[in-house]
Amino acid sequence: MHLRTLLPLALAATAAFAQTAKVSPEKEASMKADLAGQIDAMKKQAQVMVDSVFSFGELGFQEFETSKYLSGILEKEGFKVERGLYGIPTSWVATWGSGKPVISLGSDIDDIPQASQKPAVGWHEPMIEGAPGHGEGHNSGVPLNIVAAIAVKRLMEREHLQGTIQLWPGVAEELVGAKAYFVKNGLFKNVDVVLFCHVANNLGVSWGPSLNQNGLVSIEYMFKGESAHAAGAPWRGKSALDAVELMDVGWNFRREHLRLAQRSHYVISNGGDQPNVVPPTASVWYYFREADYEHIMDLWQKGDNMAKGATLMTDTTFTSRLLGSAWPGHFNKAIAEDMYENIKKVGLPTWSDDDQKLAKGLQKELGVRVTGLATKIQEMRSPRLPQNTDAEGGGEGFGNQPTGGGSDDIGDVSWVVPTVTLRYPSNIPGGPGHNWANGVSMATPIAHKGVVAGAKVQAMTMVDILLHPGLVKAAWDYFNNVETKELKYKSFIRDQDKPAIWLNQKTMEQYRDRMKQYYYDPAKYDTYLEQLGIKYPTVR
């Protein structure tokens, strides 16, 4: 197509986008008030979705019930749904609308191994001993996005606003297993802004990089030796398990000489069959975390060297495979600042005495500071400043040096399109994370109220993006001229790597039939707590 043809098309597209901005401040305020009212009217739908996904309790890559349920709701609302993207059976993307801007909403859906917990009970009481459960709160984010998207869709239809809404789930986030494949395969190539959300204990948003979030690679090392009778002829065996243990010992000695920012941890994923057989196969699964791409790759190389050394000591061989990866995030200033204005408009939920009683009861049980639920919104976090550290250089922050921490593969998305993460207050302060305690509130009024508040913020920010082309322009200006000016995204995924969709399959097969007995039935029960016969709250 010639430039002479392209230019009028580009101008027409810009004009069509700009037309949506011709709204008075009074009209815009009225639209946002209408959105808040719509979302309040959808409280019941939000509660049902949150409770239903909590009851499914599915681990990463095995979120079949969850994905079917959530994508089905969007389909009934008129969204076009594509399922099973990029070789990941539980992935999907839902779209509605046409033209620019394209606003993409994402949140995670998987849960935590061995985190089964009765909601609203302020001590450890699993529904099924050893089963997975939502000990991170990922049952709430996509319901939040669905409520926001439906409300904005109705507003767009009524006001004849142009734009496209896209929704997708973060599959296997706890394995950092999917978003890098979404990026690599172009899910976000036409997207203008990504609004992600994640459960927290307050309303908040931040911009820039973070000193206490790492990227990572997830690598499994698989050793191969030779079996033998462990008592009758051990000299004829070559123990793959010995190789695993020697690699782990070597890595544990090396930790002393690694940077403060690094975090590394492992589990032995195959330790052999039984003691009287020299293990011919064994494997160990590592997470190597660091603050940037180069240092992550350095840890990966060090891990490979440890594995090679272990094989030399044991006359074994090894292969390895990438199971997941994540970049450290860098979040957009323009969108975060706009979102924070909407956070101030919405404010925190009004917590009941029972809400506070559950929070304080759980905090007392955990032996942490008893503060109850947050009653004041967080301030916008400064870029590159860690949470809960001494900004003057003492304490855990070590001045302006990376301190390390967890990882989330939304980081990969943030390096290809302007992205922010909304934190919403559905959890109780003081939980250790990845733990039964973080699931206590997640099918209670605390979670429901937090989702409704978050949906209002998400929806209002979407309207700002629809009405103000300059906001998208500012977002991309920051993305191009600050975030990616000197640092460009390079995927950890190699051509031979595939999504590790077999992970957690055996665990879910072990528990799924028993878990089905606890699936929420909203046709019979008003809430999941009613179905379970749990008094709200139940505390000591």
PLM feature spans:
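Hydrophobic h-region of N-terminal signal peptides that target proteins for export
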Residues: 10-18, 42
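Structural recognition of the beta-strand scaffold that forms the well-ordered cores
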Residues: 82, 102-106, 166-169, 193-196, ...
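Acidic-glycine-rich active-site phosphate/pyrophosphate-binding loop
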Residues: 110-124, 212-222, 428-435
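Histidine/acidic-residue-rich, glycine-tolerant segments that coordinate divalent metal ions
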Residues: 124-133, 139-140, 157-279, 289, ...
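Bacterial N-terminal signal peptides that target proteins for export
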Residues: 1-7
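Acidic/His- and Gly-rich active-site-bordering loop/insert found
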Residues: 20-134, 143-164
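Metal-dependent amide/peptide-bond hydrolase catalytic core
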Residues: 245-540
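Divalent metal-coordination and catalytic microenvironments
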Residues: 53, 94, 105, 138, ...
